[in-house]
């Protein structure tokens, strides 16, 4: 993995201190594969998540699991009239604490499966770095595992918040373009540590085998670490770019957008060596950012979701438009560190298309550096959702 030492340190980062009991960290891997029999291309993901891991280090605690808190003596007191039934709390709400593995596919027929374990059942080696849990593992070059969830598992454990299915993967990856820092705030750190990554190997979902090829994988890896997410949650990224100016595929190009942080977004762009980085925590005079997320009609009866982003400073202007068919978006939910059955609910798609323009400011004029078509963009929009207790 030919990345900077700073990015390597970020890739290996695991929870320490207060974050172990009140926080989370995540490794997210996204890539494309081609089905061996039909040639159909699909977008896949694998995620490793640590949520409040030290709260209950010996067994996973899921916040949505039903836990009756009424004791026999409480019922006797109700019958005796010493306390009222209204004062009884019928369900105990626990703070979530676990290691979670997720894998799935985006687009038509999207689904995800998941597995949960505890910190004590997780093995983390520092040199060489390797993270292993639930029969799944990853290092700085290898990503492998298997997750199986049956329909009966979901009936018994609706708190899993996933689908049934069997997914296994055996992959190698090579990070081609890394950004060690994307956003650093008081409660959250985000890094597109593998903004452009080549994956190779196989990904099998419910018996369908997909080949993951380096030149067609359009891989992406990022890291989240902290105590809380910021909302709304917005993400766009793609390394599948084609120059509208020259018609050539841009082999060494990528862009990533992440936010929203105090009404600002972070943006990293590299178009064939022309690199621009905007970090949301920087002073408001350093750059301005504008974004919008909306629904718009397509062909009269279908809808698309539309992301627009414009960022500029004294030297550069970046304009991005991305569209994703609404029917191909997948709703995903995940628990938040604060517990109380609060979740982040995201619309996620892997078939975004659009355009990106990069301009350089020369006095009062704009010089167009690149104008490119965007394909297979990862598109996400999320909000916080609070359950009624």
Predicted regions: what is each one?
Residues 1-389:
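Structured soluble/peripheral alpha/beta segments that form catalytic or ligand/cofactor-binding pockets
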């Amino acid at each position: 993995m030919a990345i900077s030492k700073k990015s390597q340190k970020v890739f290996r980062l695991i929870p320490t201190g207060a974050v172990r009991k009140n926080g989370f960290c995540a490794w997210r891997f996204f890539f494309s594969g081609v089905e061996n029999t039909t040639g159909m291309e699909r977008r896949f993901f694998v995620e490793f998540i640590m949520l409040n891991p030290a709260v209950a280090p010996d067994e996973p605690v899921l916040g949505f699991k039903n836990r009756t808190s009424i004791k026999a003596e409480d019922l006797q007191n109700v019958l005796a009239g010493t306390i009222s039934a209204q004062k009884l709390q019928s369900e105990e709400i626990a703070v979530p604490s676990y290691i979670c593995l997720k894998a799935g596919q985006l687009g038509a027929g999207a689904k995800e499966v998941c597995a949960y374990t505890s910190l004590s059942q997780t093995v983390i080696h520092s040199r060489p770095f390797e993270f292993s849990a639930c029969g799944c593992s990853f290092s700085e070059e290898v990503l492998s595992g298997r997750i199986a969830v049956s329909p009966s598992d979901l009936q018994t454990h609706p708190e899993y918040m996933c689908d049934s299915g069997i997914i296994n993967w055996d992959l190698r990856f090579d990070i081609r373009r890394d950004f060690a820092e994307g956003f650093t705030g008081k409660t959250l750190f985000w890094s597109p540590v593998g903004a452009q990554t080549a994956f190779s190997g196989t990904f099998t979902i419910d018996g369908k085998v997909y080949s993951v090829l380096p030149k067609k994988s359009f891989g992406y890896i990022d890291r989240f670490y902290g105590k809380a997410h910021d909302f709304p949650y917005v993400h766009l990224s793609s390394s599948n770019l084609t120059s509208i100016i020259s018609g050539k595929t841009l082999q060494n190009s990528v862009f990533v957008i992440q936010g929203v942080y105090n009404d600002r977004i972070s943006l990293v762009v590299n178009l064939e060596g022309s690199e621009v980085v905007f970090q949301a925590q920087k002073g408001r005079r350093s750059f301005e950012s504008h974004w919008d997320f909306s629904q718009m009609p397509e062909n009269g009866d279908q809808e698309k979701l539309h992301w627009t982003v414009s960022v500029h400073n004294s030297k550069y202007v970046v304009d991005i438009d991305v569209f994703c068919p609404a029917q191909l978006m997948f709703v995903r939910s995940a628990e938040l560190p604060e517990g109380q059955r609060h979740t982040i609910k995201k619309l996620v798609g892997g078939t975004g298309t659009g355009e990106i323009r990069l301009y350089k400011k020369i006095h009062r004029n704009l010089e167009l550096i690149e104008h490119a078509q965007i394909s297979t963009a990862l598109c996400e929009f999320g909000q916080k959702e609070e359950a009624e207790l």
